Amino acid sequence: MEPGSVENLSIVYRSRDFLVVNKHWDVRIDSKAWRETLTLQKQLRYRFPELADPDTCYGFRFCHQLDFSTSGALCVALNKAAAGSAYRCFKERRVTKAYLALLRGHIQESRVTISHAIGRNSTEGRAHTMCIEGSQGCENPKPSLTDLVVLEHGLYAGDPVSKVLLKPLTGRTHQLRVHCSALGHPVVGDLTYGEVSGREDRPFRMMLHAFYLRIPTDTECVEVCTPDPFLPSLDACWSPHTLLQSLDQLVQALRATPDPDPEDRGPRPGSPSALLPGPGRPPPPPTKPPETEAQRGPCLQWLSEWTLEPDS
């Protein structure tokens, strides 16, 4: 597979207010490091110099984040109003994301909900990594929830592998990678949370891809499906042999799922009160005044947890 380049940028959605790109793997979104010759910011500036905004730090308003090693859908707001509209969707938990991944081993269950709380790893030598609650050095674990559906079983370079669809219901740093590792099925090619191998035929990339994205803003619904990169025609090392669930059917189900009501100020997915039965739920909170800058802080912190891997 060809590495990324400044000239090679795939656009999967464009409107007056938004762009959605299909980010190449092993490409940072932005960086202040002079040695970074390839970033998504530089790709955008090369393709769309007229869209760069000098009032922003990097020239473009990225609505969310993807890890350096992760490929797939990433939304860019083209003006301040559009960025605010996307921000409200994230704040109100109305954004839907789904990822494709190749995981080590054959997962026997057809569907799994992973609910390990995730916190920072303070263990020496594990800086900038995350871990599940109960692990040595786990600090400030927060509730985390991921739905997993097994699509196919097969072999990758002769080793058993499962192709899965992952839907994060919370947004912790490295959530999908940590949850899959905790399940005993790390992402193929994940050198941080998977098995470190000295084999020369190790995968050329981490097999995690942001496949589906839906942001129902006030003015338009930004919805995209990016091409599936985990096909035998694209990677000869991947050889599926058993189909368990149709990806097309899952996409149809994702598209048919109604968006949450923005007026519903109920608990966030995975929060304790969200799991209470109907009669036991607390009454709805009173109408709140407009959000202040101080009140925006917690949500901005939440958004920052869809974080990039640190420069190294």
Curated annotation (Swiss-Prot):
UniProt cross-references to Gene3D superfamilies, sorted A to Z: Pseudouridine synthase
GO molecular function ontology, one term from the record: pseudouridine synthase activity
Xref: Pfam families: PseudoU_synth_2
Region (Disordered): 256-298
Keyword Acetylation on entry: yes
Top-level taxonomic group: Eukaryota
Modified residues annotated as N-acetylmethionine in this record: 1
BP terms from Gene Ontology: enzyme-directed rRNA pseudouridine synthesis
CDD domains: PseudoU_synth_RluA_like (cd02869)
Active site as annotated: 67
Keyword Acetylation: yes
Biased composition (Pro residues): 279-289
Keyword terms of this UniProt record: Acetylation
Family (UniProt): Belongs to the pseudouridine synthase RluA family.
Name this polypeptide is given: RNA pseudouridylate synthase domain-containing protein 1
